[in-house]
């Protein structure tokens, strides 16, 4: 006998059926909700659900651009507090690829310090963070509730010989960009005057990276070096953080349509960045112009080859102290084309994956497309590359 006014089994079944119908109809936004105490912005139920069920991967996302703060984290584990952790949890990003550019005659020693520091940081805070080493780690990181750290470098100057690839793989390195913006023994960077492609030494390094399961990244590489890498590598070559030169005429850090098509042919993934001068040559520059780059790649090779490589921390370059910002700009050639601002509004805060997902909804991407872009596509290709 069911009591009047009580919640009955029939009511529960009806509610469950209604929920199933709602989940089966993702095109229905079903309202908008404010989910961050620090912001009045509201997000659609569809986007909240998409972010909630996706594995979010930022294939160039630093934990901080304040390197003095980072040095304190390394020197004194207690200096990293729950307040420092909270923005990463709020972002819902599950994996941060924290690669930086190390080069020159001290590259090997600097790389040793880099990996020692980050391995120590992760070990000291293993209740919060985990190192991403394998496809299995990518599968379980979201369930674990921890923030995944993917160790990489944006230059391969630290490889003195092919055997060094094995050594640094043992220290946790899973991605290596062949060059930064300048020439090295492997190939040529994007801002060099001439690009003569991959050297014999570089080909040997790529071969060893394929063998041990370390991803080849060509985001900062010159045009010839980029294409050579696709020809030489037996595994997919990544472009973790770049944009489309067809939309930013002549910018050396953006990739040609030919390079983008190589990504598709290799069954790889291209990560779009929101760095302002890589998005548009003049103002205004908005999130809609960033979305144009997603559309361009989608139209050339399909949404299954798209991902995110923001190339910033959670707050962006424009939030850096002015002197640090000035020093950063001074380290690049004029061809970078810096303007007053470096970031794009809407992608310069911890909630940026939500804003990006809302933009992709506006551009009529399907739920499966968006899940792939937010991280599923990089998860797929990294798992393939890391298999040996």
Predicted segments with their positions:
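N-terminal hydrophobic targeting/anchoring segments and the immediately downstream early-domain regions
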Residues: 6-193, 249-388
